[in-house]
């Protein structure tokens, strides 16, 4: 084997060709905007969507790739990463559909907004498969810094500027905390950077039992908990969600959160296998706090965006049940729930954007009587909210059933019962909005609904919103009825990933010893 063949085999760059497609798309958008100018806004969004969908198709052809490691082990393109990378790419696709009209109306550059969003997407996709400390941190910062820029993109809006500053300050602090935990891992392993090598070296040093490893675990979990909005690292979420542009909030609630969970699985299962019981205990506590606080505080909210912020905190708590179960069923149900959460949550945000574009408000009380003026929007928002609440036969019901069943099988009886109780609480504040929209008496309509403008889908940027809404509602409805194919996909991604199988077997052995 000559030198060039050896280098090519070690780099294995074909593993990241989905990301390569997005990089090319990003360059086309930047160059097209420079050459054509602001008139490019008529076609650039569709170029971005085409590139993202091409990347998803490329991910499909990467499935069951026998040679998953690339760049000297820095990136792992296994089936687990493929699913999470697809979730990030699809969330960006729907977010761009909902952004066109919103950004145009704000008077800011659409091309720059899409370019920043594609950069965040690249960060999230690389983070989903990162298998080395430097790769993890660079991907995390790529996602985070792009998110800060998008949060403050509406420069004329003081709330957007405030949200960006809060997000930047708290996000920078969490990155520093995470980096400190990662640096401890680097030192404990004797200078190793790939996760597999770190796990092997730590095992050989005092059997892996050291105060340094425990401290590293705490700092790393703090950084991850910030990214997934887990209590008590959630303080930024309500203010940032309320003040940020709504399409950005939609991306943060799905794409960024999915990348955070992908990081949690790969880093904790591989590098912290020796302290598995400890990090499972910590995530159990985080799940309890997130489910209780997220769903209880959401009851008192008057803003739709703020209500969905606390809802997303509660939803993160539900997903953590699958993580703490540490079984094939647990990881599969976790991935399945994130797949359906993608459509039901983004569908809800599309409805919020449509209502805000027509009325200029996101106050829950202003939705009163909406059914009489806009039945399509009422139907779409009702389906998405009821699915988030777990009402059968919508997708959210089956997602929660799978999560709770996986937790019950793993002996997490208290956690599952608490999940059921908080899920019932969440149904109340979702149904409250639905009930408000379908009031029949004209005198009960809000002022915003009484002055509701004529529905015109032929305005610039409205067709993409309509397409996004229809796709999200159909996916939310059908994913519940046809949940088996999606769950089989999630199961295949888990059973074909060696690190998860090793973790599950280790748990079974330790339980048998007890």
Curated annotation (Swiss-Prot):
Its source organism is Gloeothece citriformis (strain PCC 7424)
For this protein, the Enzyme Commission number is 7.1.1.-
Q: Which domain of life is it from?
A: Bacteria
InterPro entries linked: NADH-Q_OxRdtase_suN/2, ND/Mrp_TM, Ndh2_N
Keywords assigned by UniProt, alphabetized: Membrane, NAD, NADP, Plastoquinone, Quinone, Thylakoid, Translocase, Transmembrane, Transmembrane helix, Transport
Compartments annotated for it: namely: Cellular thylakoid membrane
Subunit info?
A: NDH-1 can be composed of about 15 different subunits; different subcomplexes with different compositions have been identified which probably have different functions.
Q: Which gene encodes it?
A: ndhB
Q: What is this protein called?
A: NAD(P)H-quinone oxidoreductase subunit 2
Kindly give the HAMAP family that the UniProt entry links to this protein: NDH1_NuoN_1 (MF_00445)
**GO CC annotation:** plasma membrane-derived thylakoid membrane
Under the heading NCBIfam families, the entry gives:
NDH_I_N, PRK02504.1
Checking PANTHER family in the record gives:
NADH DEHYDROGENASE (PTHR22773)
Q: Which reaction does it catalyse?
A: a plastoquinone + NADH + (n+1) H(+)(in) = a plastoquinol + NAD(+) + n H(+)(out); a plastoquinone + NADPH + (n+1) H(+)(in) = a plastoquinol + NADP(+) + n H(+)(out)
First-listed, main subcellular location of the protein, grouped into a coarse class = membrane
UniProt enzyme class: translocase
* One BP annotation, GO: ATP synthesis coupled electron transport
Q: Which residues form the signal peptide?
A: none
Write out the GO MF terms.
Answer: NADH dehydrogenase (ubiquinone) activity; quinone binding
